[in-house]
Design a protein with these regions (language model features):
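TRNA-recognition modules of translation machinery and tRNA-sensing kinases, especially anticodon-binding
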Residues: 1-429, 438-446
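Intrinsically disordered, low-complexity terminal tails/loops enriched in metal-binding residues
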Residues: 435
Length: 446
C-alpha cells in the first residue's frame, strides 16, 4: 500500500467541514475589510525566496523544498506567501493602481520536523496591503487576525509588538548588536556564528540559543530608532489603543525573515498547556521588499497564520466551528426503474436544495436509518403505487409525520415546508404548536 508522505495529512469528513467553516469565516471578515482574493503558483523560482527570506534564514537554508525541472531550472515549493504575492504584484504591474489589498488561503511547504499542529504541507491564511505608509494600515492588519480570534471565541488574545525601524534605524541597531555579541561569539551555536557574519539579526530568532543568557540581555531595537521611526511606532500603538486592542511592546519579538522593517508582531491567545503554540499569527511591515525584487519602491504590510495550529487551538478550547451537515431531502426509490426518481433528485438539486438518494438498493427500513444518519430533514418514498397514483409519501424526519402529497403539489409543498422549518420568527398566539403559516405568526419569511 502506498501511504501519504511524512508531514502531510488527508482532509475529509468532520475535519474538512471545520476547514471550510474557518475559510468562510475568514473570507467574510476579509470582505468586510475590503480585501481581494489572490492566488499564486505553488512553485516559484528558488531565487525568489533567496532574495526575500534571505539565504541565511532557516526557511531557505534548511526548510525549503528545492528541485530541478527537466530544463535544469532551480524551483522551490512555496514556503510562505508574502514573496509570491510581491512577485505577482511586480510582474503584473499592480503598482499602477494603489492601494492594493489581498488575502489568500494557500498550501505552503517546509521541510520541518512534523509535530501536532505543524506539518510539512500546511495551509496558511494571509493578508498583504500595498501602497501606504500610514500607521493606520499597520493597525488594520493587526486588527484582522485579532478580530478573527475573538470572533472564534478564543480568550486572552494579545498582540506582542516591536519595531525594527527604517533602514537607518535597522543599521544602527545591527551595529550595536554586533558590538554586543562580538565578545560572546564562542558561546553561540554554530549556525549563529555563521549568522553573525552574514546577518546578525537572525541570531535573535535562533531556536537553539533561545535560552542563552547572552541573548537575554541584548540591546533593544527601540533604543536605536531615529525620530521618524519612533514617531511612526508611537502612531501604530496609538491606533491600536483606539481600537481597544490588547498589546504588549516586546523587544524580543523579531521576525525571522530579511524583508521586515518597522512594525513586527505576533498574536497569541491564552490556551492552557498549549506551550509555544500559543502564538497563532505573525506579520509586520516590509517597505523594502518590492524594491528588492526590482519593482518600484512600495510600502507594504501583512501577516500569515496557519490554519492547522488555529484549528488545534479551537479543539483544545472545545470550540466547534463546523456546521452540522444536513440534507434537505432524501429520495428513496422503491421501483425497479429508477429513472423517474433519479430525474426528481436532479430537479430538486437544480432548485438549490441539498438532496441525496439511495444508490445501494437498501430495504425501506435501512433507508430510513440512513436518512437519520445523514440528518435528512425530509424523506420522499417513490414506489410502484406512488408512480401509478401520482403521489409521493413525504416524511418529516423530525416530527415523524407522514403525508401523501400529489405529484403536482410536491414541489410547492417541499419548498414551503423547508422554508417554514428554517424560520425562527416569533408567533403572537403563544401556542407552541402554532402553524408558522398562520395569520398570527409574526414572520417576514413568507
Amino acid at each position: 500500500m502506498i501511504s501519504k508522505q511524512k508531514g502531510t495529512y488527508d482532509l475529509y469528513g468532520e475535519e474538512a467541514r471545520k476547514v471550510l467553516a474557518l475559510r468562510n469565516i475568514f473570507e467574510n471578515i476579509m470582505n468586510n475589510f475590503n480585501y481581494s482574493f489572490i492566488r499564486t503558483p505553488v512553485f516559484e523560482s528558488t531565487e525568489l525566496f533567496k532574495r526575500t527570506s534571505g539565504e541565511t534564514s532557516d526557511v531557505v537554508s534548511k526548510e525549503m523544498y528545492e528541485f530541478k525541472d527537466k530544463k535544469d531550472r532551480s524551483l522551490a515549493l512555496r514556503p510562505e506567501g508574502t514573496a509570491s504575492v510581491a512577485r505577482c504584484f511586480i510582474e503584473n504591474k499592480l503598482y499602477t493602481d494603489l492601494p492594493r489589498k489581498f488575502w489568500y488561503f494557500e498550501p505552503m511547504y517546509r521541510y520541518d520536523r512534523p509535530q501536532k499542529g505543524r506539518y510539512r504541507e500546511h495551509f496558511q491564511f494571509g493578508c498583504e496591503a500595498y501602497g501606504s505608509n500610514d500607521a493606520r494600515v499597520d493597525a488594520e492588519i493587526i486588527s484582522i487576525p485579532y478580530h478573527l480570534f475573538e470572533t472564534l471565541g478564543l480568550e486572552g488574545v494579545k498582540v506582542r509588538i516591536n519595531t525594527l525601524g527604517d533602514n537607518e534605524s535597522r543599521e544602527n541597531y545591527k551595529k550595536a548588536l554586533v558590538d554586543y555579541l562580538k565578545p560572546h561569539i564562542d558561546s553561540l551555536c554554530e549556525d549563529c556564528k555563521e549568522r553573525f557574519n552574514k546577518n546578525p539579526l537572525r541570531i535573535l530568532d535562533c531556536k537553539v540559543d533561545k535560552d542563552n543568557e547572552i541573548l537575554k540581555n541584548i540591546p533593544k531595537t527601540i533604543d536605536y530608532l531615529n525620530e521618524e521611526s519612533k514617531t511612526f511606532f508611537d502612531e501604530v500603538l496609538s491606533y491600536l489603543d483606539s481600537l481597544e486592542i490588547c498589546y504588549e511592546v516586546d523587544p524580543k519579538t523579531i521576525r525571522g525573515l530579511d524583508y521586515y522593517t518597522h512594525t513586527v508582531f505576533e498574536i497569541e491567545a491564552n490556551i492552557k498547556d498549549f506551550g509555544a503554540q500559543n502564538v497563532l499569527c505573525a506579520g509586520g511591515r516590509y517597505n523594502n521588499l518590492v524594491e528588492n525584487l526590482d519593482g518600484p519602491a512600495t510600502p507594504a504590510v501583512g501577516f500569515g497564520l496557519g490554519s492547522e495550529r488555529l484549528l488545534l487551538a479551537l479543539e483544545h478550547e472545545n470550540i466547534d466551528i463546523a456546521l452540522t451537515k444536513s440534507v434537505d431531502v432524501y429520495v428513496i426509490p422503491m421501483t425497479s426503474d429508477k429513472s423517474f426518481s433519479f430525474s426528481l433528485v436532479y430537479l430538486l438539486r437544480t432548485l438549490g436544495l441539498s438532496v441525496e438518494t439511495d444508490y445501494l438498493n437498501r430495504k425501506l427500513a435501512n433507508n430510513f436509518k440512513y436518512a437519520e444518519k445523514i440528518n435528512a430533514k425530509y424523506t420522499v418514498v417513490i414506489g410502484e403505487d406512488e408512480i401509478e397514483k401520482e403521489y409521493f409519501t413525504v416524511k418529516n424526519m423530525k416530527t415523524r409525520e407522514e403525508e401523501k402529497v400529489s405529484k403536482n403539489e410536491f414541489l410547492k409543498y417541499i419548498l414551503e415546508h423547508l422554508e417554514q422549518d428554517d424560520c425562527s420568527c416569533s408567533c403572537d398566539c403563544g401556542e407552541d404548536d402554532c402553524d408558522k403559516g398562520c395569520d398570527c405568526h409574526d414572520c417576514s419569511c413568507f
